[in-house]
Amino acid sequence: MGKVRTKIVKRTARELLEKYPNLFTRDFEHNKKVVSKLIETKSKKLRNQIAGYITHLVGIKLKRQIQA
């Protein structure tokens, strides 16, 4: 089964991607650093979940661009 992400993770990731679309890449480590600069998270786990979901969304976006 896949990983379940909470609303806060999905909402925050989508908001960050909308505001700063050019800051994120398919590299998780890079996205993790960018997320930590943009928002203050209460825990590393939450920061990593947001960065991971952003990485996932960027990958989907790139695949769609290639297919189009």
Swiss-Prot record:
Identify the SUPFAM superfamilies for this entry: Rps17e-like (SSF116820)
Q: Which GO terms describe its molecular function?
A: structural constituent of ribosome
What InterPro entries does the record tag this protein with?
A: Ribosomal_eS17, Ribosomal_eS17_sf
Q: What keyword terms does UniProt attach to this protein?
A: Ribonucleoprotein, Ribosomal protein
Task: Tell me the superkingdom of the source.
Answer: Archaea
GO BP terms: translation
List cellular component terms (GO): ribonucleoprotein complex; ribosome
What protein family is recorded? Belongs to the eukaryotic ribosomal protein eS17 family.
Could you identify this protein by its name?
A: Small ribosomal subunit protein eS17
